[in-house]
Amino acid sequence: MHISELTHPNELKGLSIRELEEVSRQIREKHLQTVATSGGHLGPGLGVVELTVALYSTLDLDKDRVIWDVGHQAYPHKMLTGRYHDFHTLRQKDGVAGYLKRSESRFDHFGAGHASTSISAGLGMALARDAKGEDFKVVSIIGDGALTGGMALEAINHAGHLPHTRLMVILNDNEMSISPNVGAISRYLNKVRLSSPMQFLTDNLEEQIKHLPFVGDSLTPEMERVKEGMKRLVVPKVGAVIEELGFKYFGPIDGHSLQELIDTFKQAEKVPGPVFVHVSTTKGKGYDLAEKDQVGYHAQSPFNLSTGKAYPSSKPKPPSYSKVFAHTLTTLAKENPNIVGITAAMATGTGLDKLQAKLPKQYVDVGIAEQHAVTLAAGMACEGIRPVVAIYSTFLQRGYDQIIHDVCIQKLPVFFCLDRAGIVGADGPTHQGMYDIAYLRCIPNLVLMAPKDEAELQQMLVTGVNYTGGAIAMRYPRGNGIGVPLMEEGWEPLEIGKAEILRSGDDVLLLGYGSMVYPALQTAELLHEHGIEATVVNARFVKPLDTELILPLAERIGKVVTMEEGCLMGGFGSAVAEALMDNNVLVPLKRLGVPDILVDHATPEQSTVDLGLTPAQMAQNIMASLFKTETESVVAPGVS
């Protein structure tokens, strides 16, 4: 049968192994075609096709709960649960989300986007089930990368003390997270894979048995059964650690053998308490290029399936903020051996893989452990090291207590570099970098800045690594820079808390922060076309705010507009409003940014329009609200 004919995942139950293999092939084909066309996560989902099909053929999906950790590997799940025909809309505005969303499907039992949450959520559902006297299975599927997160280990520790609570944890062990895994847990799993008995079983056993006199040829057809039996004899303690924690352990099993998976899941489902199924998979399975380069093909922009290469841009683009950050930090680190870059399993995304390649002794990857990364940096700062924590804005949320308790209370000079701040696009609400201004500016002993372009990012990097007055943070957006000239050396640090005037006018004061400075300048051009002259200020710092510059300008001009790519509640505009009120400068103020909503998946350009943050929209808003000018549209050549 064809997967498009499936009307419910429970229909997998009646299919033969051969039919399930055909369904798996079709899922993998659709997965590849869709990601190649529209972009998305490639390797994770390809690695769990058979796992998903086998598991769903043993469950009753009308009542059983399946929780996928992170969710980027759940594309096969989406295709099997009613979204096959819409899958071509993956990660597009109003289309299928790239992660799990409870609002999208009744089969998405728990939304996610960040790692290490599935076991906690699954255990919560299992305890609620038992408290209500209900009967359904709960399965949490977690990767070996996410298993390095402390939250996952906390949940395992808890579940292991509940011997009568039925919960199945499936470890999708593909030796990878996004970048190669680090830490003792990863090392233990690798030790299991690479142990002499396991290597003998996987590499040599069949050849040795073939050469046995008289019986070798007759045993060859039963080779898989022989391997399985001997595996259980020679590696009986593979799951010793897990069983000591209170789980019944199964594995490691072949994550691409439907029969072995189904047989194991059926046995595991009979266990009356917590059970742990260790499944070995290959990330990118079925697409040779992705199997060979599991980091490079973790996630892809649209690409040519034959060559594996992304489609070339119609015109050259400036380097991304991440690339400029990585290049500049590496240059600074060469000059100062006390600079150390720290990442939480995002070396490639943040650009710190460049630092690792050039200066490995000045690079630390802690795994998916943001809390640990922050306090590790605090400890380093105590000893005179200049730690630079490169982290996505959305992930720094996970280390919030550590920022306050371990860094700022002790006034330690830790430098936080927040990549993907602001609108991130197709990854959706779990990854939007909207909240960092609000959650950081309220903390004492912390400076918060944002560059208007990639050249100013270089200056702020120098500022950050030389700042000793406490913690300092820099937020910068996803994507390419503006295209301004860059310096290779000789960067000068900025004066803390000092803004700059970029344009002068007497009618309205436009205060742009970070990525909104250039849109502020474009907005000023549009206002000029309508006879309104604006002063444009690049704020640079939201904390400390340059009140010496801003307050006199606001008082003289009499109308103020703030522009930010972040949430309005507690954000840059709020900081300006507080400063105006505290100093009794009572002038009209218009704050432009992200209102109290979740920004769903779409392209950054689409989200910008939806939020009313294009220069044309902002100019129209300003004229309507501050100048009471009625106009249907504001258009200027080359400005949207």
Swiss-Prot record:
Enzyme class: transferase
Residues binding thiamine diphosphate: H72, G113, H114, A115, G145, A146, N174, Y287, E370
Gene3D superfamilies, A to Z: 3.40.50.920, 3.40.50.970
A Pfam family recorded for this sequence: Transket_pyr
Keywords per UniProt: Isoprene biosynthesis, Magnesium, Metal-binding, Thiamine biosynthesis, Thiamine pyrophosphate, Transferase
SMART domains found in the cross-reference section: Transket_pyr (SM00861)
Keyword Metal-binding attached: yes
PROSITE patterns, sorted: TRANSKETOLASE_1 (PS00801), TRANSKETOLASE_2 (PS00802)
Domain of life the protein comes from: Bacteria
Record-stated family: Belongs to the transketolase family. DXPS subfamily.
Subunit details: Homodimer.
Biological role: Catalyzes the acyloin condensation reaction between C atoms 2 and 3 of pyruvate and glyceraldehyde 3-phosphate to yield 1-deoxy-D-xylulose-5-phosphate (DXP).
Name the UniProt record assigns to this protein: 1-deoxy-D-xylulose-5-phosphate synthase
Organism of this sequence: Synechocystis sp. (strain ATCC 27184 / PCC 6803 / Kazusa)
Upper lineage: Bacteria, Bacillati, Cyanobacteriota, Cyanophyceae, Synechococcales
Gene: dxs
